[in-house]
From Swiss-Prot:
It comes from Escherichia coli O157:H7. Residues 1-17, 74-90, 166, 248-256, 302-304, 365-366 are periplasmic. Residues 39-52, 112-144, 188-226, 278-280, 326-343, 388-397 are cytoplasmic. The gene is lplT. Keywords: Cell inner membrane, Cell membrane, Lipid transport, Membrane, Transmembrane, Transmembrane helix, Transport. This is Lysophospholipid transporter LplT. Catalyzes the facilitated diffusion of 2-acyl-glycero-3-phosphoethanolamine (2-acyl-GPE) into the cell. It holds the Pfam family MFS_1. The keyword Cell inner membrane applies. PANTHER family: MACROLIDE-EFFLUX PROTEIN (PTHR43266), MAJOR FACILITATOR SUPERFAMILY (MFS) PROFILE DOMAIN-CONTAINING PROTEIN (PTHR43266:SF2). Disulfide bonds: none annotated.
């Protein structure tokens, strides 16, 4: 437990293995829990408009704690912060298992996720260095994508068998993540002894927001990534209602399979962007962003499984090609102005605010009785128009 970052910077050190395993199990639990809890809402006859509210309480925790979680990660050993955060997730999942209101339990999971995010990326630079750090980030992303794919499908498949079994599996995944965190070496805090004056912390965070917003390139990146992830999470919930209407399938597993196609496509698109787009040619990604909206519109009109799977894979490819260069631009420019950690925290705030707004509009549309197919058509058209407007604005500035 006393292994030092200075004594072992191997990519496959005990500490690095523990981080990757913990990340996989934690992300697996996050994705499985979403679909397991959605199945619970269906089983308990909650109204359809309440489904996106579940994700809204989750991202609300991110927004509420955005000014503070970065300092928490830097003020304590990051492995212990990760363990505490996964403990909160475990408590939230277990509370849903034992009949506590699912929205309350899921909010607790959101608080844990908000605390976990800055620590999981920050610890990589403390466990390894140099070129190995890039590879470590690659391992982290690979484990996350694998967890999204397997967790989403597992949540839906297990929920079709028994909802309680699916929820229990999520709790076990979080429990495994807590155990894995124990094996992360207890490293020194990066910035101990900082002031915990909440007003000053909030002011400092708002200053970082202002600095990034005043820079044309980082503002462009923030708006683009926020639109993308807001649309992405809304599409997840759109699929849950779209599948029974368009395909006539009422199980919990099919929407998870469709979501998995998007995740696979993102990996392919991200790889293509890495080869074809540089920081100097970021605007090359913009046509892909516009096409996302067009393909969502076409997808909404489908009634057969094969075209639906293919179009969602294409949406993922376009999404990966669109968002990866924007992320790289923000990290590079943000690192020089407000620091990488602050840039990520501001980006998290923007993306989660967009998710909250888009999910709120989607929930309202469902509540007033707009059919899911017209919602999908309008959603795709508006997204394409928004990215077109962003591209025109970027070219003028």
């Amino acid at each position: 437990m006393s292994e030092s970052v200075h004594t072992n910077t191997s990519l496959w050190s005990k500490g690095m293995k523990a981080v990757i395993v913990a990340q996989f199990l934690s992300a697996f639990g996050d994705n499985a829990l979403l679909f397991a809890t959605l199945a619970l809402l269906k089983a308990q006859f909650y109204p359809e408009w309440s489904q996106p509210i579940l994700q809204m309480v989750f991202v609300g925790a991110y927004i509420l704690f955005a000014p503070f979680v970065g300092q928490v990660a830097d003020s304590f050993a990051k492995g212990r912060v990760m363990m505490f955060a996964n403990g909160l997730k475990l408590l939230g999942a277990a509370s849903i298992c034992f009949g506590i209101n699912p929205f309350l339990g899921y909010t607790l999971v959101g608080v844990g996720a908000a605390a976990y995010s800055p620590a999981k990326y920050g610890i990589l630079g403390e466990l390894t260095t140099g070129s190995k750090l890039v590879k470590a980030n690659g391992l982290m992303e690979a484990s996350t994508i694998a967890a999204i794919l397997l967790g989403s499908v597992a949540g839906g498949v297990l929920a079709d068998w028994h909802v309680l079994v699916a929820l229990a599996a999520c709790a076990l995944a979080y429990g495994g993540a807590v155990v894995a965190n124990i094996y992360i070496p207890k490293l020194a805090a990066a910035r101990p002894g900082q002031s915990w004056n909440l007003i000053n912390m909030t002011r400092s965070f708002l200053n970082a927001c202002t600095s990034l917003w005043r820079n044309g390139e980082t503002r462009f990146s923030l708006v683009g990534t926020s639109l993308f992830w807001g649309a992405g999470v809304t599409l997840r919930f759109l699929l849950v209602l779209w599948v029974p209407v368009a395909l006539g399938i009422t199980d919990n597993a099919t929407p998870t399979y469709l979501n998995a196609m998007v995740a696979i496509g993102i990996v392919v698109g991200a790889g293509a962007a890495a080869k074809l787009v540089t920081l100097e040619t970021v605007s090359r990604c913009m046509p892909a962003g516009i096409l996302i909206g067009v393909v969502v519109l076409i997808f909404s009109l489908q009634h057969e499984q094969l075209p639906a799977y293919a179009l969602l894979m294409l949406i993922g490819v376009l999404g990966g090609f669109f968002v990866v260069p924007l992320n790289a631009l923000l990290q590079e420019r943000g690192k020089k102005s407000v620091g990488a950690g602050n840039a990520i925290a501001v980006q998290n705030l923007g993306e989660n605010s967009a998710m909250l707004l888009m999910l709120g509009i989607y929930s309202l549309a469902v509540m007033v009785g707009i059919p899911v197919v017209p919602i999908g058509i309008g959603f795709g058209a508006l997204f394409a128009l928004a990215i077109t407007a962003l591209w025109i604005w970027q070219r003028r500035h």
